[in-house]
Amino acid sequence: MSKRKKNKTNYSKSIFRIASLVILTCLVYLIFGGNIGPIKFQGYLPQIKKHFSKGKNAVTSKQQSGSGLYLYDGTAIPEYSKEQIITLNNDKPFFTVDEINSLVNSHYFTYGGQDMYGRATSAIATVSKDDLVASETRKGIELPNPKGWVGRSKGGIYDRSHLIAYTLGGKNDLDNLVTGTISFNQKYMTQVEGDVRDYIKSSGHSVLYRVTPYYRGDELVPIGVLMEASDGSSFIRNRFVYNVQDGFTIDYKTGEVKEN
């Protein structure tokens, strides 16, 4: 091959590579709208994207079903206004079809683990009658301190609060504990926990149960928790419990409290 032909061939290949690179760059720009970076799903789950929208204080948390990371910021949840527990989505939980179907052929307790700040992120379980535990059996068990815990001496308003209650088979470690007020834990979370426990006892059916804490940004104490339950049929719950205590102001970033 002559030197001229060889140079012409190399020149054609170079033009082809440049053209390909330009086309690829244009495609990427069109797909991502010029905002190339980490891709995060918007919403508590992709199937219910419409329920949650992006906010300034969004936090990435591990979604417990193994489907990756989801961005949720609770903007569909109204600001706390006297009602410490509210019903969402007409009490219909946000479970996927696959999650509901897991009631039929599997039994599990799955925890989302702790995020980069050491906070518990989520817990989901198929709770059966065999998982129910009498509360008396927990006496003497020492619980670790979750993030934001400042002890009972500073205001005396906190409990080490289980995501999945001990009486429903939940474990006693930091994957399943958050700092919650006594009112939040003992008065309002127990309402949903009691409903689940009573239904399982009376019906003998298993219940799909999920509790997800909501944090603002890097705050250590959750603003509240989303509690969902379903037997796959008539028994359903979808409640949000606010982590507040009458007469006190909470610094959710540190856990410090001040009496009003």
Identify what each model region corresponds to.
Residues 21-24, 44, 62-64, 72, ...:
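Alpha-helical protein-protein interaction elements
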Residues 1-14:
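N-terminal Lys/Arg-rich, disordered targeting/topogenic segments
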Residues 17-33:
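Hydrophobic membrane-insertion alpha-helices, especially the h-region
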Residues 97-98, 102-260:
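Domain-level detector of nuclease and nuclease-like folds
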Residues 36-100, 107:
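N-terminal, intrinsically disordered, polar/charged segments of Gram-positive cell-envelope systems
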